[in-house]
């Protein structure tokens, strides 16, 4: 079965939870001059422009905002904090639709045998093209946001969609997928079990899988998903340029299977080469498969097992995507593993910002990078990491708020009721 060859272990990071608010490891393989075949495949020349051309045609498309948290930056002693707010992406509350829509577009273009030109969305919706394509059912597994994006794209183009979720997926996230006409199947176990189940059933039912994670023999579509994500990176660079900034010095990006993180890493490696920003990958400590893969030090992706019980539902993945791993193992500098209270703190800080800063609605998976940055900037026990990352007054830091309020009930428990509180030893000294 896919990815069955990955070594699996239960993480023992929580044994050190009393020492630091997060665990970190430096990537010894992050050579700034090194390239890899996976990166060349991921981002061939011109692919970001093709993705942006498609996304501009989507109903309701506009660039999501890039927000400056200048007040918080001053408080933390850094030059600037810039947040790409994907909670405002196409009214879908997440960036994920960028990947799912582009993967479907590329699949249909290939199925139609069109290589010498790009298709328009109007052409894809035309009766002539639909008659040629016939009945297609797209299928995927999700923790919520990717499935919602695929369901939206399938509905926009008039195709059926089946989405598999694991048993811990919240009812609001399931309803959000069903709102776009998809059939939802709930699978016992974790997200990784849902991936295995949809792979099995898709073969039996003739469905076409649109997954953001790869496995042996299935790489084209996950590659297209990651290419779709580069639209938001191109938007960021355009928006930063409008503020007189050529590039961020540091990027903190969250990771589940690693698809978005690899797209970010690959985009900046291709754009800036050795001058690329310092990149930190941020994961839940209970689902830190990329952190664990770096820690093992053998150059191979490693899985983590267990229930993956974290409030960061969108990042609760035990199996890294091999395609993403090939890029991240060479292009990411640091890997951080965070307990849930780090994400909860980020949610509250976004929602009740420093005076003068804009407020941002951010879900658990969207906010963990802000929480991690705050501890990194202020906690004395992380001084070595600050030094290694060269974080200081000249730093221009990029964060991506990958999701908004995708589970309103849990959001209120954390933000309104103070759920998942910060332990006393890790609270700010006021």
Please tell me what each predicted stretch does.
Residues 3-430:
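PLP-dependent amino-acid enzyme catalytic core
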């Amino acid at each position: 079965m896919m990815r069955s060859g990955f070594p699996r272990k239960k993480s023992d990071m929580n044994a050190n939870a009393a020492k630091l608010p997060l665990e970190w490891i430096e990537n010894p393989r992050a050579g700034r001059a090194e390239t890899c075949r996976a990166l060349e495949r991921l981002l061939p020349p011109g692919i970001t422009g093709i993705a942006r051309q498609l996304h501009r045609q989507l109903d309701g498309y506009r660039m999501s905002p890039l927000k400056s948290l200048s007040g918080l930056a001053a408080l933390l002693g850094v030059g600037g904090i810039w947040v790409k707010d994907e909670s405002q992406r196409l009214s879908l509350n997440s960036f994920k639709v960028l990947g799912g829509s582009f993967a479907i577009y590329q699949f249909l273009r290939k199925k139609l045998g069109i290589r010498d030109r790009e298709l328009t969305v109007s052409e894809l919706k035309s009766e002539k093209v639909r008659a040629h394509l016939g009945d297609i059912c797209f299928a995927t597994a999700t923790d919520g946001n990717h499935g919602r994006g695929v369901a939206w794209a399938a509905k926009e183009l008039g195709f059926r969609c089946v989405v598999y979720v694991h048993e811990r997926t919240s009812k609001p996230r399931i309803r959000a997928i069903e709102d776009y006409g998809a059939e939802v199947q709930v699978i016992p176990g974790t997200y990784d079990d849902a991936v295995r189940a949809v792979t099995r059933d898709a073969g039996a039912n003739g469905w076409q899988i649109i997954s953001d994670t790869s496995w042996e023999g299935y790489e084209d579509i996950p590659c297209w998903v990651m290419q779709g994500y580069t639209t938001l990176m191109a938007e960021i660079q355009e928006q930063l340029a409008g503020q007189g900034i050529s590039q961020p010095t540091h990027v903190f990006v969250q990771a589940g299977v690693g698809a978005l993180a690899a797209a970010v890493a690959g985009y900046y490696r291709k754009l800036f080469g050795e001058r690329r920003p310092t990149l930190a990958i941020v994961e839940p400590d209970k689902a830190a498969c990329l952190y664990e893969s770096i820690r093992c030090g053998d150059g191979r992706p490693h899985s983590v097992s267990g229930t993956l019980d974290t409030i960061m539902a969108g990042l609760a993945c035990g199996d890294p995507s091999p395609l993403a791993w090939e890029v991240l193992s060479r292009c990411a500098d640091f890997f951080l593993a965070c307990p849930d209270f780090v994400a909860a703190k980020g949610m509250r800080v976004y929602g009740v910002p420093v005076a003068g800063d804009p407020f941002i609605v951010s879900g658990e998976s969207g906010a963990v990078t802000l929480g991690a940055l705050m501890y990194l900037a202020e906690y004395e026990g992380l001084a070595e990491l600050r030094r290694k990352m060269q974080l200081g007054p000249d730093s221009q830091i990029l964060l991506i708020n990958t999701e908004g309020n995708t589970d309103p009930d849990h959001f209120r428990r954390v933000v309104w009721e103070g759920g998942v509180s910060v332990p006393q030893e890790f609270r700010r000294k006021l």
